[in-house]
From Swiss-Prot:
Gene Ontology, cellular component aspect: plasma membrane
Entry protein name: Cardiolipin synthase B
Main location per the UniProt record: membrane
Keyword Cell membrane: yes
Location of the active site: H113, K115, D120, H290, K292, D297
Role played: Catalyzes the phosphatidyl group transfer from one phosphatidylglycerol molecule to another to form cardiolipin (CL) (diphosphatidylglycerol) and glycerol.
GO BP term, pick one: cardiolipin biosynthetic process
Gene giving rise to this polypeptide: clsB
Amino acid sequence: MKCSWREGNKIQLLENGEQYYPAVFKAIGEAQERIILETFIWFEDNVGKQLHAALLAAAQRGVKAEVLLDGYGSPDLSDEFVNELTAAGVVFRYYDPRPRLFGMRTNVFRRMHRKIVVIDARIAFIGGLNYSSEHMSSYGPEAKQDYAVRLEGPIVEDILQFELENLPGQSAARRWWRRHHKAEENRQPGEAQVLLVWRDNEEHRDDIERHYLKMLTQAQREVIIANAYFFPGYRFLHALRKAARRGVRIKLIIQGEPDMPIVRVGARLLYNYLVKGGVQVFEYRRRPLHGKVALMDDHWATVGSSNLDPLSLSLNLEANVIIHDRHFNQTLRDNLNGIIAADCQQVDETMLPKRTWWNLTKSVLAFHFLRHFPALVGWLPAHTPRLTQVDPPAQPTMETQDRVETENTGVNP
């Protein structure tokens, strides 16, 4: 499947769970025909229970609902929680589930990391938020800072087609859609141009990274990137410095406190390389950064699930949208500049680690390990990821009057 730019779309930026979850649950509540939901994480907490209730109500009123969860990111949903949905008719699948070894999850690589919702070919959501109370400010200091978009217009048809291509048993649905569906002539609720891009392990291995590189090459005035896990390849780093050196203002927002020590060590090498190359690096300090967004000049932006690290760029299944829209671009710029002013600390040369032989050795080793990590994973025994559907619970046998009389008389019904 290949997608092209679609015009006439309406797009809304959603920040954190306070904006995202009410919008998603409202759309599910208004669904009439079909819901497709993909996510990496679904926890059985307050947010997860609200999603459960919304999907259950939709299925009970006759809406066809399908859910795809990652087997690593969502391993602990209770049988009761899932069975209630499947009993109501929700099709519930896990992406590549694996048994635990000594209580530890073993399926850490090549994950389904996308976060997509499609409602009736009318509305779609795509971004970085999972379904967890961690995305609500009420969660406390560890609440995540994140973004998603709500989409209406022709791009939703592309996102639905993408989902139908990737879910099993959908060949008949795809054929029916192509034969019978005609886009409504005037169904262009907005002015945004939008392109769906994704990363898989087949024909689209580097599509998301390629669009980033093209953006950096074309930038003339300003680029702002906010990304939770920033550890791209040589080409990306070189493109950043090259853009900065030709006068483009580059602002890079990353986590102030990475959750893995090796990432912190490697990042210090990036700080030296980028800051001395003219890139403005900002550490977001208010709370954990989980966003994956960027903008360029006045008209280019992206929002989605893809980090800029080896896992997202080389192993995981990811999805972003690329957006050409001046109003959306300005909205995102205002938001990112706001968190830079209020919640970030700029990295300057006084904060860079001393270039001793020991610090340099540690940074170089960590950097090259992380960059070659996908290749190292490639040496592991290959397997074909599978989708495992959860069967509805068995229904108890009904004690009908005919059955009672048959058992009493010994006569076949």
